[in-house]
């Protein structure tokens, strides 16, 4: 028996683990019996096909199981695989999962479940289980090295319903340069959108909603940076874009109530309590909804 297969069985799982089984299938192939022969071209197609078959038809319960298996697989990496294989295997798995969740399904429920399941890891960007910070390729290709993060992809496609969920979980507040997300929403060239009920969503209306959502998170939005980009010849998706950025984000004093929202959310974010921690606060429901970016 192959050493890697033996080591995989050393880790005890309460039931059959999707990813452990997938490794077993890979290492049983005669062409992969020697570690030196392992490489993307050898096993990537099998990983993608296996996970794609699951993700294409999976419901929320099934997706919950898949994420649980992946977390258990990574956390209990007593498998002791060759380092390069371990990194490449998990990289392909993450690329495939994010591709199907964000680029193929575009379902807010799946996005929220992914955030809930990996919430404990999001504060450490280097953690392999902080999936929301990993990159993927929107047009699928084996390597995500030239990919983008889910937040940037959602900004490019102006999926306002998914952006709202990401913002509620504090993903924009964790960005080093959040203005880049605003610039992407406003200036990224439009392209074919995900179809919902076989109807194409009005991209301009979604862009307006995305700008409004960002204004609920940020205290300032640099109009100067936007105008600089426009002076270089870039064209905004919304012609009257300034109408959708509150004056209190770029010229007038910021509202006190919004500053309070930012302060409370920042404290909750520091303790990894967004958004659930909002609803444990002993305040009226209307204020809870305000903190949760509903208005």
From Swiss-Prot:
Occurrences of domain SOCS box (ranges): 243-295
Start and stop residues of the ANK repeats: 146-176
Keywords, sorted A to Z: ANK repeat, Ubl conjugation pathway
Keyword tRNA processing among UniProt keywords: no
Tissue-by-tissue expression: Specifically expressed in testis. Localizes to spermatogenic cells in testis, with highest expression in round spermatids and condensing spermatids and lower expression in pachytene spermatocytes.
Any GO BP annotation: intracellular signal transduction
InterPro entries xref list: Ankyrin_rpt-contain_sf, ASB17, SOCS_box, SOCS_box-like_dom_sf
Domain of life of the source: Eukaryota
UniProt keyword annotation of Ion transport present: no
Pathway linked to the protein: Protein modification; protein ubiquitination
Entry GO CC: apical ectoplasmic specialization; cullin-RING ubiquitin ligase complex
Function: May be a substrate-recognition component of a SCF-like ECS (Elongin-Cullin-SOCS-box protein) E3 ubiquitin-protein ligase complex which mediates the ubiquitination and subsequent proteasomal degradation of target proteins.
Record-stated family: Belongs to the ankyrin SOCS box (ASB) family.
Domain observations: The SOCS box domain mediates the interaction with the Elongin BC complex, an adapter module in different E3 ubiquitin-protein ligase complexes.
The protein's name in its UniProt record: Ankyrin repeat and SOCS box protein 17
Record gene name: Asb17
């Amino acid at each position: 028996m192959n050493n890697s297969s033996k080591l995989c069985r050393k880790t005890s799982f309460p039931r059959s683990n999707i990813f452990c089984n997938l490794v077993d299938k890979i290492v049983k192939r005669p062409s992969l019996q020697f570690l030196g022969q392992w490489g993307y071209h050898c096993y990537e197609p099998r990983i993608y096909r296996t996970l794609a078959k699951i993700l294409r038809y999976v419901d929320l319960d099934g997706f919950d199981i898949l994420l649980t298996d992946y977390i258990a697989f990574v956390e209990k990496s007593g498998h002791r695989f060759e380092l390069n294989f371990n990194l490449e295997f998990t990289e392909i798995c993450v690329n495939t999962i994010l591709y199907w969740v964000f680029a193929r399904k575009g379902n807010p429920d799946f996005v929220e479940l992914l955030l809930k399941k990996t919430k404990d890891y999001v504060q450490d960007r280097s953690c392999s289980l902080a999936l929301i910070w990993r990159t993927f390729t929107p047009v699928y290709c084996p390597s995500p090295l030239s990919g983008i993060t889910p937040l940037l992809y959602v900004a490019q496609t102006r999926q306002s319903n998914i952006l709202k969920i990401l913002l509620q979980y504090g993903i924009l507040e964790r960005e080093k340069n959040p203005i880049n997300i605003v610039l992407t929403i406003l200036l990224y060239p439009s392209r074919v959108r995900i179809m919902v009920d076989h109807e194409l969503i009005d991209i301009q209306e979604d862009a307006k909603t995305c700008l409004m959502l960002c204004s609920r998170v940020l205290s300032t939005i640099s109009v100067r940076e936007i105008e600089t980009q426009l002076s270089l010849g870039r064209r905004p998706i919304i012609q009257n874009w300034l109408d959708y950025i509150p004056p209190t984000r770029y010229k007038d004093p910021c509202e006190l109530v919004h500053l309070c929202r930012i302060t409370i959310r920042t404290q909750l974010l520091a303790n990894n309590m967004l958004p659930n921690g909002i609803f444990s606060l002993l305040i009226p429901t209307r204020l809870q909804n305000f903190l949760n970016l509903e208005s």
